[in-house]
Structure formats: structure tokens, C-alpha cells
Amino acid sequence: MISKEFLESLIDLTEEQGIDLCRENGYDFRTVSKDGVSYIITMDLRFDRVNFEIEDGLITSANVG
């Protein structure tokens, strides 16, 4: 299970840094929005996947999904 602390550690990282950190910890990831544009995503809930929201190249939100 992805911890709250791990999710919080992603905030203010670049998208690339967040991807690397997720890979190092064995988690899948996806960007669900970037600079206010929401992407079409599947609605399945996965407890091993992190959803990123990106603004100006930095992760502003990270949650399990």
C-alpha cells in the first residue's frame, strides 16, 4: 500500500523525478492533469498506482488510484 508520507514526498518534484521515485518503489503512475488540462483516464481504482497532477512542470497533487 502506498503511504501518505510517500505521496507527500512527491509534491514539488518534477514529473520526471516523481516517475523515477515511483519506479524505484515499484509503483505504477500516471499523469491525470497537466497545467489545468485533465486527461481521459480509466476509472479503475488501483492501490499500486499514483495519480499525478502537474502545474508548471511540478507535481502539485499525488494520490492513490
Q: What is each residue range found by the language model?
A:
Residues 1-65:
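Exposed, flexible binding/inhibitory loops of compact, secreted disulfide-stabilized domains
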